[in-house]
Amino acid sequence: MTVIVPIHSPAVAPAPAPERVGVLLVNLGTPDSCDTKGVRIYLREFLSDPRVIENQGLFWKLALNGLILQTRPARKAKDYQKIWNHEKNESPLKTITRAQAHKLATSLSDRGHLVVDWAMRYGNPSMRSRIEAMVAKGCSRLLVVPLYPQYSAATSATVCDQAFRVLSELRAQPTMRVAPPYFRDSAYIDALANSIRSHLASLPFEPEIIVASFHGMPQAYIEKGDPYQAQCIATVDALRERMGLGDNKLLLTFQSRFGFDEWLQPYTDQTIQKLANDGVKRLAVVMPGFASDCLETLEEIAQENAETFLHNGGEHFSAVPCLNDSDGGIAVIRQLVLRELQGWL
Protein backbone atom coordinates (compact mmCIF):
# COMPACT_ATOMS: atom_id res chain seq x y z
CA MET A 1 0.00 0.00 0.00
CA THR A 2 1.29 3.35 -0.93
CA VAL A 3 0.99 6.10 1.64
CA ILE A 4 1.11 9.63 0.38
CA VAL A 5 2.22 12.13 2.98
CA PRO A 6 1.43 15.72 2.11
CA ILE A 7 4.41 18.00 2.30
CA HIS A 8 3.68 21.42 3.74
CA SER A 9 5.98 24.20 2.68
CA PRO A 10 7.06 26.44 5.53
CA ALA A 11 5.27 29.74 5.73
CA VAL A 12 7.05 32.38 3.74
CA ALA A 13 7.31 35.76 5.39
CA PRO A 14 6.26 38.67 3.22
CA ALA A 15 9.09 40.58 1.67
CA PRO A 16 10.02 43.58 3.77
CA ALA A 17 9.02 46.98 2.50
CA PRO A 18 11.84 49.14 1.14
CA GLU A 19 13.78 50.58 4.07
CA ARG A 20 13.02 54.22 4.73
CA VAL A 21 13.91 56.89 7.27
CA GLY A 22 11.09 58.80 8.93
CA VAL A 23 11.11 62.36 10.25
CA LEU A 24 8.23 63.21 12.58
CA LEU A 25 7.63 66.84 13.56
CA VAL A 26 5.73 67.05 16.84
CA ASN A 27 3.94 70.10 18.18
CA LEU A 28 2.02 70.56 21.43
CA GLY A 29 -1.56 70.00 20.41
CA THR A 30 -4.93 71.47 19.64
CA PRO A 31 -8.64 70.75 20.07
CA ASP A 32 -10.41 69.17 17.13
CA SER A 33 -13.10 71.84 17.36
CA CYS A 34 -13.48 75.27 18.92
CA ASP A 35 -16.61 74.43 20.90
CA THR A 36 -16.75 73.64 24.60
CA LYS A 37 -16.85 69.87 24.07
CA GLY A 38 -13.79 69.83 21.82
CA VAL A 39 -11.79 72.03 24.17
CA ARG A 40 -12.81 69.92 27.18
CA ILE A 41 -11.54 66.73 25.51
CA TYR A 42 -8.25 68.42 24.69
CA LEU A 43 -7.75 69.95 28.13
CA ARG A 44 -8.51 66.66 29.87
CA GLU A 45 -5.72 64.93 27.95
CA PHE A 46 -3.30 67.83 28.35
CA LEU A 47 -3.85 68.45 32.05
CA SER A 48 -3.82 64.72 32.89
CA ASP A 49 -0.19 64.42 31.77
CA PRO A 50 2.08 64.16 34.84
CA ARG A 51 4.80 65.93 32.88
CA VAL A 52 2.54 68.99 32.66
CA ILE A 53 0.94 68.85 36.11
CA GLU A 54 3.39 66.88 38.19
CA ASN A 55 1.15 66.45 41.22
CA GLN A 56 -1.56 64.17 39.85
CA GLY A 57 -2.88 63.27 43.30
CA LEU A 58 -6.47 62.94 44.41
CA PHE A 59 -6.90 66.67 45.06
CA TRP A 60 -5.81 67.55 41.51
CA LYS A 61 -7.99 64.87 39.94
CA LEU A 62 -11.02 66.13 41.85
CA ALA A 63 -10.23 69.72 40.87
CA LEU A 64 -9.61 68.80 37.23
CA ASN A 65 -12.75 66.74 36.77
CA GLY A 66 -14.79 69.14 38.85
CA LEU A 67 -14.30 72.88 38.66
CA ILE A 68 -11.60 73.08 35.95
CA LEU A 69 -13.23 70.95 33.26
CA GLN A 70 -16.63 72.40 34.06
CA THR A 71 -15.62 76.05 33.68
CA ARG A 72 -12.36 76.47 31.77
CA PRO A 73 -13.38 74.80 28.44
CA ALA A 74 -16.15 77.33 27.78
CA ARG A 75 -13.79 80.26 28.38
CA LYS A 76 -11.03 78.76 26.28
CA ALA A 77 -13.48 77.87 23.50
CA LYS A 78 -14.28 81.58 23.13
CA ASP A 79 -10.56 82.31 22.83
CA TYR A 80 -10.09 79.61 20.18
CA GLN A 81 -13.06 80.97 18.22
CA LYS A 82 -11.25 84.32 17.89
CA ILE A 83 -8.32 82.76 16.02
CA TRP A 84 -9.89 79.63 14.45
CA ASN A 85 -9.14 78.82 10.82
CA HIS A 86 -12.77 78.50 9.75
CA GLU A 87 -11.88 77.73 6.14
CA LYS A 88 -10.15 74.50 7.18
CA ASN A 89 -12.12 74.14 10.44
CA GLU A 90 -8.97 73.77 12.51
CA SER A 91 -6.69 75.78 14.75
CA PRO A 92 -3.86 77.82 13.22
CA LEU A 93 -1.38 75.57 15.03
CA LYS A 94 -2.59 72.59 13.01
CA THR A 95 -2.58 74.55 9.76
CA ILE A 96 0.94 75.83 10.33
CA THR A 97 2.44 72.55 11.56
CA ARG A 98 1.08 70.76 8.49
CA ALA A 99 2.62 73.45 6.28
CA GLN A 100 5.95 73.13 8.09
CA ALA A 101 6.01 69.38 7.44
CA HIS A 102 5.01 69.82 3.80
CA LYS A 103 7.67 72.46 3.12
CA LEU A 104 10.31 70.46 4.96
CA ALA A 105 9.45 67.42 2.84
CA THR A 106 9.75 69.53 -0.32
CA SER A 107 13.13 70.87 0.77
CA LEU A 108 14.34 67.30 1.35
CA SER A 109 12.78 65.80 -1.77
CA ASP A 110 16.19 64.88 -3.17
CA ARG A 111 16.47 62.34 -0.34
CA GLY A 112 14.15 59.79 -1.90
CA HIS A 113 13.89 57.40 1.03
CA LEU A 114 12.82 60.05 3.57
CA VAL A 115 9.25 60.16 4.89
CA VAL A 116 8.28 63.43 6.60
CA ASP A 117 5.14 63.57 8.73
CA TRP A 118 3.72 65.59 11.62
CA ALA A 119 1.77 64.94 14.80
CA MET A 120 0.45 66.52 17.97
CA ARG A 121 1.37 65.40 21.46
CA TYR A 122 -2.24 66.02 22.52
CA GLY A 123 -5.16 65.78 20.14
CA ASN A 124 -4.95 64.84 16.48
CA PRO A 125 -3.17 63.66 14.45
CA SER A 126 -1.83 61.66 17.36
CA MET A 127 1.77 60.55 17.66
CA ARG A 128 0.58 56.95 17.83
CA SER A 129 -1.29 57.15 14.53
CA ARG A 130 1.59 58.79 12.68
CA ILE A 131 4.35 56.56 14.06
CA GLU A 132 2.33 53.47 13.16
CA ALA A 133 1.70 54.90 9.68
CA MET A 134 5.40 55.60 9.16
CA VAL A 135 6.33 52.08 10.25
CA ALA A 136 3.74 50.73 7.81
CA LYS A 137 5.46 52.73 5.05
CA GLY A 138 8.72 50.93 5.76
CA CYS A 139 10.44 53.39 8.11
CA SER A 140 12.97 51.33 10.03
CA ARG A 141 14.60 54.46 11.45
CA LEU A 142 12.75 57.39 12.94
CA LEU A 143 13.84 60.89 13.92
CA VAL A 144 11.37 62.58 16.26
CA VAL A 145 11.63 66.38 16.21
CA PRO A 146 9.92 68.18 19.11
CA LEU A 147 9.18 71.67 17.80
CA TYR A 148 10.43 73.36 20.96
CA PRO A 149 13.65 75.42 20.74
CA GLN A 150 14.05 75.27 24.52
CA TYR A 151 13.85 71.96 26.38
CA SER A 152 11.36 71.39 29.17
CA ALA A 153 10.13 68.21 30.80
CA ALA A 154 6.60 69.52 30.20
CA THR A 155 7.14 69.73 26.44
CA SER A 156 10.13 67.89 24.96
CA ALA A 157 10.25 65.11 27.56
CA THR A 158 6.60 64.22 27.24
CA VAL A 159 7.08 63.86 23.47
CA CYS A 160 9.83 61.33 24.21
CA ASP A 161 7.60 59.57 26.75
CA GLN A 162 4.83 59.15 24.21
CA ALA A 163 7.15 58.04 21.42
CA PHE A 164 8.68 55.33 23.60
CA ARG A 165 5.20 54.36 24.82
CA VAL A 166 4.13 53.74 21.24
CA LEU A 167 7.32 51.82 20.44
CA SER A 168 6.86 49.65 23.53
CA GLU A 169 3.75 48.16 21.93
CA LEU A 170 5.40 47.36 18.58
CA ARG A 171 7.04 44.03 17.87
CA ALA A 172 9.13 45.41 15.02
CA GLN A 173 10.41 48.66 16.47
CA PRO A 174 12.15 51.28 14.36
CA THR A 175 15.45 52.62 15.62
CA MET A 176 14.68 56.04 17.05
CA ARG A 177 16.51 59.30 17.60
CA VAL A 178 15.14 62.47 19.19
CA ALA A 179 16.34 65.88 18.02
CA PRO A 180 17.78 68.04 20.81
CA PRO A 181 16.69 71.59 21.66
CA TYR A 182 18.15 74.29 19.44
CA PHE A 183 17.88 77.32 21.74
CA ARG A 184 21.18 78.89 20.68
CA ASP A 185 21.82 77.36 17.26
CA SER A 186 23.13 80.11 15.01
CA ALA A 187 20.55 79.32 12.31
CA TYR A 188 17.73 79.77 14.84
CA ILE A 189 19.11 83.02 16.28
CA ASP A 190 19.74 84.38 12.76
CA ALA A 191 16.21 83.47 11.68
CA LEU A 192 14.71 85.16 14.74
CA ALA A 193 16.79 88.31 14.24
CA ASN A 194 15.93 88.50 10.53
CA SER A 195 12.25 87.91 11.23
CA ILE A 196 12.15 90.65 13.87
CA ARG A 197 14.00 93.14 11.66
CA SER A 198 11.74 92.40 8.70
CA HIS A 199 8.58 92.77 10.77
CA LEU A 200 9.71 95.99 12.43
CA ALA A 201 10.61 97.45 9.04
CA SER A 202 7.01 96.91 7.93
CA LEU A 203 5.53 98.84 10.86
CA PRO A 204 4.48 102.51 10.70
CA PHE A 205 6.21 103.06 14.05
CA GLU A 206 9.51 102.20 15.73
CA PRO A 207 9.12 100.29 19.01
CA GLU A 208 10.82 101.79 22.03
CA ILE A 209 11.13 98.34 23.59
CA ILE A 210 10.84 94.73 22.40
CA VAL A 211 9.53 92.10 24.82
CA ALA A 212 10.64 88.49 24.29
CA SER A 213 7.83 86.45 25.84
CA PHE A 214 8.23 82.73 26.55
CA HIS A 215 5.67 80.27 27.85
CA GLY A 216 5.96 80.12 31.62
CA MET A 217 6.15 77.20 34.02
CA PRO A 218 5.98 76.75 37.80
CA GLN A 219 9.10 77.95 39.58
CA ALA A 220 9.12 74.63 41.45
CA TYR A 221 9.89 72.77 38.21
CA ILE A 222 13.05 74.82 37.74
CA GLU A 223 14.08 74.14 41.32
CA LYS A 224 13.78 70.42 40.56
CA GLY A 225 16.34 70.78 37.77
CA ASP A 226 14.43 71.69 34.61
CA PRO A 227 16.83 73.62 32.29
CA TYR A 228 14.06 75.57 30.56
CA GLN A 229 14.65 78.96 32.19
CA ALA A 230 18.40 78.85 31.57
CA GLN A 231 17.81 78.02 27.91
CA CYS A 232 15.32 80.89 27.51
CA ILE A 233 17.90 83.25 28.99
CA ALA A 234 20.57 81.89 26.63
CA THR A 235 18.28 82.48 23.63
CA VAL A 236 17.60 86.08 24.60
CA ASP A 237 21.26 86.76 25.36
CA ALA A 238 22.21 85.46 21.91
CA LEU A 239 19.42 87.46 20.27
CA ARG A 240 20.50 90.66 22.05
CA GLU A 241 24.04 90.14 20.84
CA ARG A 242 22.95 89.39 17.27
CA MET A 243 20.68 92.45 17.11
CA GLY A 244 22.90 94.81 19.08
CA LEU A 245 20.24 95.43 21.75
CA GLY A 246 20.81 96.00 25.45
CA ASP A 247 18.86 94.23 28.16
CA ASN A 248 16.79 97.40 28.63
CA LYS A 249 15.68 97.27 24.98
CA LEU A 250 14.97 93.54 24.65
CA LEU A 251 13.22 92.28 27.78
CA LEU A 252 12.68 88.65 28.82
CA THR A 253 9.27 87.71 30.27
CA PHE A 254 7.08 84.63 30.81
CA GLN A 255 3.41 84.25 29.92
CA SER A 256 0.44 81.87 30.26
CA ARG A 257 0.62 81.16 33.99
CA PHE A 258 -2.09 78.87 35.30
CA GLY A 259 -3.23 78.11 38.85
CA PHE A 260 -2.01 79.60 42.11
CA ASP A 261 1.64 78.51 42.27
CA GLU A 262 4.48 80.92 41.65
CA TRP A 263 5.60 80.76 38.02
CA LEU A 264 8.70 82.04 36.26
CA GLN A 265 8.96 85.80 36.41
CA PRO A 266 8.73 88.53 35.29
CA TYR A 267 5.21 87.91 34.04
CA THR A 268 4.48 89.14 30.52
CA ASP A 269 1.09 90.70 31.23
CA GLN A 270 2.30 92.59 34.29
CA THR A 271 5.41 93.79 32.46
CA ILE A 272 3.39 95.08 29.51
CA GLN A 273 0.97 96.90 31.78
CA LYS A 274 3.84 98.47 33.74
CA LEU A 275 5.59 99.61 30.57
CA ALA A 276 2.41 101.37 29.48
CA ASN A 277 1.93 102.90 32.93
CA ASP A 278 5.54 104.11 32.85
CA GLY A 279 4.96 105.99 29.62
CA VAL A 280 6.13 103.59 26.90
CA LYS A 281 4.00 104.32 23.84
CA ARG A 282 5.37 101.94 21.20
CA LEU A 283 5.91 98.24 21.92
CA ALA A 284 6.63 95.04 20.00
CA VAL A 285 6.48 91.50 21.38
CA VAL A 286 8.29 88.49 19.95
CA MET A 287 7.72 84.91 21.13
CA PRO A 288 10.93 82.97 20.43
CA GLY A 289 9.87 79.80 22.25
CA PHE A 290 7.00 79.08 19.87
CA ALA A 291 7.93 77.50 16.54
CA SER A 292 4.37 78.05 15.31
CA ASP A 293 1.72 80.64 16.03
CA CYS A 294 -1.02 79.33 18.29
CA LEU A 295 -3.55 80.38 20.93
CA GLU A 296 -0.83 81.74 23.22
CA THR A 297 0.61 84.00 20.52
CA LEU A 298 -2.39 84.96 18.39
CA GLU A 299 -4.92 85.47 21.18
CA GLU A 300 -3.08 85.90 24.47
CA ILE A 301 -0.34 88.20 23.17
CA ALA A 302 -1.68 89.76 19.96
CA GLN A 303 -5.14 90.41 21.42
CA GLU A 304 -5.28 90.26 25.23
CA ASN A 305 -1.90 91.82 25.96
CA ALA A 306 -2.27 94.32 23.13
CA GLU A 307 -5.52 95.47 24.73
CA THR A 308 -3.81 95.73 28.13
CA PHE A 309 -1.07 97.91 26.66
CA LEU A 310 -3.41 100.21 24.75
CA HIS A 311 -5.86 100.60 27.64
CA ASN A 312 -3.06 101.66 29.98
CA GLY A 313 -1.65 104.47 27.90
CA GLY A 314 0.23 102.70 25.11
CA GLU A 315 -0.39 103.85 21.56
CA HIS A 316 1.21 101.34 19.19
CA PHE A 317 1.55 97.57 19.72
CA SER A 318 2.66 94.78 17.41
CA ALA A 319 3.18 91.06 17.87
CA VAL A 320 5.97 89.62 15.72
CA PRO A 321 4.79 86.43 13.95
CA CYS A 322 6.52 83.20 14.90
CA LEU A 323 8.90 81.65 12.39
CA ASN A 324 6.11 79.31 11.27
CA ASP A 325 6.57 77.97 7.72
CA SER A 326 8.58 80.98 6.54
CA ASP A 327 11.72 80.32 4.55
CA GLY A 328 13.78 81.15 7.63
CA GLY A 329 11.71 78.90 9.85
CA ILE A 330 11.96 75.93 7.49
CA ALA A 331 15.70 76.48 7.12
CA VAL A 332 16.08 76.15 10.90
CA ILE A 333 14.18 72.86 10.99
CA ARG A 334 15.92 71.55 7.87
CA GLN A 335 19.38 72.19 9.29
CA LEU A 336 18.41 70.52 12.57
CA VAL A 337 17.00 67.48 10.77
CA LEU A 338 19.99 67.02 8.45
CA ARG A 339 22.39 67.31 11.37
CA GLU A 340 20.53 64.70 13.41
CA LEU A 341 20.17 62.33 10.43
CA GLN A 342 23.93 62.05 9.94
CA GLY A 343 24.89 58.43 9.42
CA TRP A 344 21.38 57.53 8.31
CA LEU A 345 21.40 59.23 4.90
UniProtKB/Swiss-Prot annotation:
Name where it mostly resides. Answer: cytoplasm
Which superkingdom, per the lineage?
Answer: Bacteria
This enzyme catalyses: heme b + 2 H(+) = protoporphyrin IX + Fe(2+)
Name the positions where Fe cation binds.
215, 296
Print the keywords alphabetically.
Cytoplasm, Heme biosynthesis, Iron, Lyase, Metal-binding, Porphyrin biosynthesis
Metabolic or biological pathway, per its Swiss-Prot or TrEMBL entry: Porphyrin-containing compound metabolism; protoheme biosynthesis; protoheme from protoporphyrin-IX: step 1/1
Its BP terms in the Gene Ontology are: heme biosynthetic process
Q: Does the keyword Acetylation apply?
A: no
Q: What GO molecular functions are on record for this protein?
A: ferrochelatase activity; metal ion binding
Q: Which Pfam families match?
A: Ferrochelatase
- EC number of the protein: 4.98.1.1
| Localization annotation | Cytoplasm
Q: Name one GO cellular component term.
A: cytoplasm
Q: Which family does it belong to?
A: Belongs to the ferrochelatase family.
What does the UniProt record say this protein does? Catalyzes the ferrous insertion into protoporphyrin IX.
What name does the UniProt record give this protein?
A: Ferrochelatase
- Organism annotation: Rhodopseudomonas palustris (strain BisA53)
Q: What is the lineage of its organism?
A: Bacteria, Pseudomonadati, Pseudomonadota, Alphaproteobacteria, Hyphomicrobiales
State the encoding gene.
Answer: hemH
